[in-house]
Amino acid sequence: MPSPSVTQECYPYQNEPTWSKSEKVIARTAFDVALGRELHDVIQKAKQLANEIQQSSDLWDLEHYLTERRKEIDRKYDYRYSQLTHVFGRLLHEGRVSEEELRGLREDKLKPIRSFAKFLAEDTAA
């Protein structure tokens, strides 16, 4: 029977899929592109809000918007491999990443990504 340390080096978590080098490249690229798209949207909205500032309360509304979006983005974009299938599932559901951009990932990753996106779609529809 192998020692626990040997088993942990091969499979850190029993149910966690392993990511090949090529999958890591695909995942990092898709992750960065999706994050860039979301940050672009935040920048556009912030510019719009800044242009509409008429009084001091509008300034604090902009600050509140930016703070909330930063918190949301920090929670959403978690690049731990143990979290990536959920991250990509959510991004797929939101339209921030496409299945085409995930092409090259093995089915053991694509299946839970699609499943989570479908779950979120059904949950939103309910």
Segments predicted by a language model, with ranges:
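Acidic, Ser/Pro/Thr-rich low-complexity regulatory regions
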Residues: P2-A126
